[in-house]
């Protein structure tokens, strides 16, 4: 993997790790789907100057626009929608464990849809990284797993499949159109699809933007600019430079980074599990890169 792709992925993973802390701050006064809507709107505004400078839709035909719209659904509305709905019916522990299947999903989908080879080293690397994430979670989280509401579990798994499809099809479109163009259109179209969803949630819960605290606005601004704009752009830059399987495994670096950020910002304890698990994740990523 080129050094540029590796740096892009590590930066994106770090920003997404911080996003969990920022999201917790935002959710104190803002409903979840409205948080998603606002962060995507802010991210879309970051891309608008480029869209105008590039000549708007003159540079892209309607067929491509339709493909980008479908891609935006996988990465925004469908992904966030099924994830949020699933969390209403299943436990957070179940959801966190299911997220470890993300890179495995990407590994399988990229083999079927893109023809990328699943080598022995790649497979072992992903499994080692999975083990690392499970160690970071710890026995308390794993032991709290329960076969509760199947509906919720299936919805969370569906959200993971959506992100896998987003990554695989995003890789294909990035190769054809370039990272900046794909990320810009996916973000803008995703924001457009989230507006009615966020508005419906706000109306149902009686939420008003005036209820949002200054700290929550700062968190949402960070989520929009750093996480939805910059991190997603870097993710697509990496997809344009490397195989989606090798890119996907970097998602396993997010849980250890999140734990470190939580320790620094929220005062949570850095445990032996975190250290050992992080070493396994790094080893797994290294194996997959060389696969």
Region locations from a protein language model:
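Specific alpha-helical transmembrane segments that line the substrate/conduction pathway
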Residues: 34-45, 75, 80-126, 159, ...
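Hydrophobic transmembrane alpha-helices of multi-pass small-molecule transport proteins
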Residues: 47, 69, 109, 118-140, ...
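Specific transmembrane alpha-helical segments of multi-pass solute transporters/efflux pumps
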Residues: 15, 19-20, 48-99, 109, ...
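Helix-helix packing/entry segments at the starts of transmembrane helices
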Residues: 13, 36-38, 95-101, 168-192, ...
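Glycine-/small-residue-enriched transmembrane alpha-helix faces in small-molecule transporters
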Residues: 1-37, 145-172, 180, 192-196
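Transmembrane alpha-helices of multi-pass small-molecule transport proteins
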Residues: 29-78, 105, 109, 162-169, ...
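Cytoplasmic-side transmembrane-helix entry/capping segments in multi-pass membrane proteins
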Residues: 9, 63-70, 118-131, 153, ...
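Membrane-interface helix-cap regions at the ends of transmembrane helices
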Residues: 18, 22-25, 29, 43-61, ...
């Amino acid at each position: 993997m080129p050094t540029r792709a590796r740096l892009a992925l590590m930066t994106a993973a770090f920003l997404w790790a911080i996003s969990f802390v920022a999201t917790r701050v935002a959710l104190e006064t803002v409903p979840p789907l409205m948080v998603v809507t606002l962060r995507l709107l802010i991210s879309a505004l970051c891309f608008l100057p480029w869209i105008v400078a590039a000549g708007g839709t003159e540079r892209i035909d309607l067929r491509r626009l339709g493909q980008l719209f479908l891609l935006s659904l996988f990465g925004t509305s469908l992904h966030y929608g099924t994830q949020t709905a699933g969390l209403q019916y299943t436990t957070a522990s179940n959801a966190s464990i299911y997220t470890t299947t993300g890179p495995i999903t990407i590994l399988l989908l990229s083999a079927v849809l893109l023809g990328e080879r699943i080598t022995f080293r790649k497979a072992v690397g992903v499994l080692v990284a999975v083990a690392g994430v499970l160690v970071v979670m710890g026995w308390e989280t794993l032991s709290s797993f329960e076969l509760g509401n199947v509906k919720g579990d299936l919805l969370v798994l569906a959200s993971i499949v959506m992100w896998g499809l987003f990554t695989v099809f995003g890789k294909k479109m990035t190769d054809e159109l370039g990272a900046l163009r794909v990320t810009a259109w996916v973000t803008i179209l995703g924001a457009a699809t989230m507006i009615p969803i966020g508005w419906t949630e706000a109306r149902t819960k009686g939420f008003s933007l005036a209820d949002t605290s200054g700290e929550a606005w700062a968190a949402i601004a960070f989520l929009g600019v750093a996480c939805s704009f910059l991190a997603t752009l870097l993710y697509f830059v990496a997809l344009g430079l490397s195989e989606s399987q090798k890119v996907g495994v970097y998602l396993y670096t997010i849980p250890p980074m999140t734990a470190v950020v939580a320790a620094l910002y929220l005062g949570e304890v850095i445990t032996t599990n975190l250290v050992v698990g992080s070493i396994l994740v790094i080893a797994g990523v290294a194996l997959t890169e060389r696969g």
